[in-house]
Amino acid sequence: MNIKGSPWKGSLLLLLVSNLLLCQSVAPLPICPGGAARCQVTLRDLFDRAVVLSHYIHNLSSEMFSEFDKRYTHGRGFITKAINSCHTSSLATPEDKEQAQQMNQKDFLSLIVSILRSWNEPLYHLVTEVRGMQEAPEAILSKAVEIEEQTKRLLEGMELIVSQVHPETKENEIYPVWSGLPSLQMADEESRLSAYYNLLHCLRRDSHKIDNYLKLLKCRIIHNNNC
């Protein structure tokens, strides 16, 4: 089939590039290369790029959690302490696809933005604290740095999406505040490692939620639920 000049060409190229990025764990292109103030990207493309970026962040979060778990937490039983102890647990989030589909579109977008904003501070301190560790594992540090950077980009992209879908929406600065820094700095190694485990567990959980939520929203807004 000759796709030259076909309307499928752009979509096919985007799919190929997206798959290549995910397989190679290479950072996706910026959601809006010219910056938010001069963004000329269509809503469809904004969603396409946001979905690729959120999936990339979730993959990195899962890999970082697995590496930390294998290196530091074998047999310590941290998982029992991590359940329901995330700083974002106060947010009312859909528990399954059915609940998500019933959620108001505007509230759904605001929820994603709130989750992303709530991770700005913990990701900054995660990078700072891991960098200061003796014999800091490079695999974990490099992923933490990348996740922090890409989460900021995803937040910028989501703010652009909100401005296009609901231009009347005022910026909402209300989001859960993280207070876990003292726990990452504890002198007791067991307590400190437990705090790191909890933070990485929550990051993996929330990045998975955002990844799923964005796919559902893209289906609803771009494809009118026909996907």
From Swiss-Prot:
GO terms for biological process: cell surface receptor signaling pathway; female pregnancy; lactation; mammary gland development; negative regulation of angiogenesis; negative regulation of endothelial cell proliferation; positive regulation of canonical NF-kappaB signal transduction; positive regulation of lactation. InterPro entries: 4_helix_cytokine-like_core, Somatotropin/Prolactin, Somatotropin_CS. Disulfide bonds join C32-C39, C86-C202, C219-C227. Changing G157 to D/F/L/N/R/V/Y: Inhibits signaling via PRLR; mutant PRL acts as a PRLR antagonist. It holds the Pfam family Hormone_1. Glycans are attached at N59. This is Prolactin. It comes from Homo sapiens (Human). The lineage of its organism: Eukaryota, Metazoa, Chordata, Craniata, Vertebrata. The gene is PRL.
